Regions:
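A structured, charge-rich N-terminal accessory region that forms the first stable segment of a protein
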Residues: 1-71
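OB-fold/S1-family RNA-binding modules
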Residues: 22-29, 33, 166-179
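Short linear interaction motifs
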Residues: 66-84, 109-115
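Structural detector for short beta-strands of small beta-barrel domains
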Residues: 78-96
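OB-fold (S1/OB) nucleic-acid-binding surfaces
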Residues: 91-114
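Short nucleic-acid-contacting surface segments enriched for D/E, G, S/T with interspersed K/R
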Residues: 115-134
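OB-fold/S1-family single-stranded nucleic acid-binding modules
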Residues: 134-177
Length: 180
C-alpha cells in the first residue's frame, strides 16, 4: 500500500523545502545546497538533514512561522511533530500496509510506502527485518520520511514467532496504530 500519486507528490513538495530550510538555516550538511531542485540526491546525505529536523523538532515551527503555507499544507507539516524515530521490526506485509513493531515499546504500526510499497522495496529480504526509521503522519496514514536504514540482523524462529505474537495480540486488541 502506498500514498496515491497526488499525495506522494505533495509529500515531497512539502518535505524537501522543509529540509532545505533546516539545512540552510543551521548549515547541517554543506554537501547539499538545494534539495528541492536537485536532479539526484544521495539518501545518506539527505538523512543527515532529516535527522537534524527530527532531533530539533522546533525547526518545524520556525519553518512554518517563516513561510506562508495554505492551511491544509500547514496542518500536514505541523503533524510531523508527532514523528516517531527509532528501530522497528518490519514483520509482515498486508493489503492495508506493512506491519512495523517498535523495538522499544512493542507498539504496532500499519505503515504505507510513499511511492513504492514496503513489500516492493524489500522483496529480496526475508521477514522480519530490523529497520531504523522515522514514522510520520500523512493525512490519515502513517508513512516514513523515506530515509530508512536496514540493520544487518537475521532473526531466528524464536524472535520471528515473538514478533508474530506481538502483531496478533495488537490485532486482537485492536491496538494497531493506523495514524499518529
Amino acid at each position: 500500500m502506498t500514498l496515491d500519486k497526488n499525495d506522494a507528490k505533495l509529500f515531497y513538495e512539502l518535505w524537501f523545502p522543509l529540509l532545505d530550510y533546516a539545512n540552510k538555516k543551521y548549515k547541517v550538511n554543506t554537501n547539499l545546497e538545494n534539495i528541492t531542485g536537485a536532479q539526484k540526491l544521495e539518501p545518506s546525505e539527505v538523512k543527515i538533514v532529516a535527522d537534524h529536523v527530527w532531533e530539533h523538532i522546533s525547526v518545524i515551527d520556525e519553518y512554518l512561522s517563516d513561510y506562508d503555507l495554505p492551511d491544509e499544507y500547514r496542518s500536514i507539516v505541523l503533524s510531523w511533530k508527532k514523528c516517531i524515530s527509532g528501530q522497528f521490526v518490519l514483520e509482515r506485509h498486508l493489503k492495508k500496509g506493512s506491519v512495523f513493531i517498535s523495538a522499544d515499546t512493542q507498539e504496532v504500526y500499519m505503515v504505507n510506502g510513499i511511492i513504492t510499497s514496503w513489500e516492493e522495496m524489500f522483496f529480496y529480504r526475508p521477514l522480519p527485518i530490523l529497520l531504523k526509521a522515522t514514522l510520520i503522519p500523512f493525512r490519515d496514514k502513517i508513512i516514513s520520511d523515506g530515509l530508512v536504514i536496514t540493520c544487518n540482523v537475521c532473526f531466528g524462529k524464536g524472535y520471528s514467532s515473538e514478533f508474530k505474537d506481538i502483531y496478533m495480540n495488537a490485532k486482537k486488541n485492536k491496538s494497531i496504530h493506523f495514524s499518529l
